Amino acid sequence: MDYRVLGVVLLSFLAYTCADPVKFVDCGSVDGKVVQVDIKPCSQQPCKLHKGQSYTVNVTFSSGVESQTSKAVVHGVLAGVPVPFPIPIDDGCKSGIQCPIVPQKPYNYVTELPVKTEYPAIKVVVEWELRDDSSKDLFCIKFPVQIVN
């Protein structure tokens, strides 16, 4: 194997694994606190999401309450209007979280975010909520993305 090719592969891998966490804002987390948000692959911010590809979203958070269930609700906010952004699995207990959720324990909510080919190529703010038994937000975060061809 050519050493230049190996070097490019290693640098690409390092860029992929050493990407900065996604910058986000809290949008009303009632029952929890988000520590970090990661999207893979995402080498720059806002993340460029390519149509027809899937991305892994990992939200590290802690809960302030006990909850037997958790449900994700995702919207793309366009001109201040939330538009539903369907995800394949909205059950947080099937997305890296071992339920029941208990207070003060760290959790990693991990799921796939598919970007459909029919989505328009635009900049959008993603609003991601994970709700508890009482439909209160364990977390609510917003972060910008750009959907590209």
Swiss-Prot record:
It catalyses: cholesterol(in) = cholesterol(out). Residues 1-19 form the signal peptide. It comes from the Eukaryota. One of its GO terms (molecular function) is cholesterol binding. It is found in: Secreted; Endoplasmic reticulum; Lysosome. It holds the Pfam family E1_DerP2_DerF2. Glycans are attached at residue 58. Keywords: Cholesterol metabolism, Disulfide bond, Endoplasmic reticulum, Glycoprotein, Lipid metabolism, Lipid transport, Lysosome, Secreted, Signal, Steroid metabolism, Sterol metabolism, Transport. CDD domains: Npc2_like. GO terms for cellular component: endoplasmic reticulum; extracellular region; lysosome. One of its GO terms (biological process) is intracellular cholesterol transport. Disulfide bonds join 27-140, 42-47, 93-99. Interacts with NPC1 (via the second lumenal domain) in a cholestrol-dependent manner. Belongs to the NPC2 family. Intracellular cholesterol transporter which acts in concert with NPC1 and plays an important role in the egress of cholesterol from the lysosomal compartment. Unesterified cholesterol that has been released from LDLs in the lumen of the late endosomes/lysosomes is transferred by NPC2 to the cholesterol-binding pocket in the N-terminal domain of NPC1. May bind and mobilize cholesterol that is associated with membranes. NPC2 binds cholesterol with a 1:1 stoichiometry. Can bind a variety of sterols, including lathosterol, desmosterol and the plant sterols stigmasterol and beta-sitosterol. PANTHER family: NIEMANN PICK TYPE C2 PROTEIN NPC2-RELATED (PTHR11306), NPC INTRACELLULAR CHOLESTEROL TRANSPORTER 2 (PTHR11306:SF68). Binds cholesterol in a hydrophobic pocket; there are no hydrogen bonds between the sterol and the protein. This is NPC intracellular cholesterol transporter 2. It comes from Danio rerio (Zebrafish). The lineage of its organism: Eukaryota, Metazoa, Chordata, Craniata, Vertebrata.
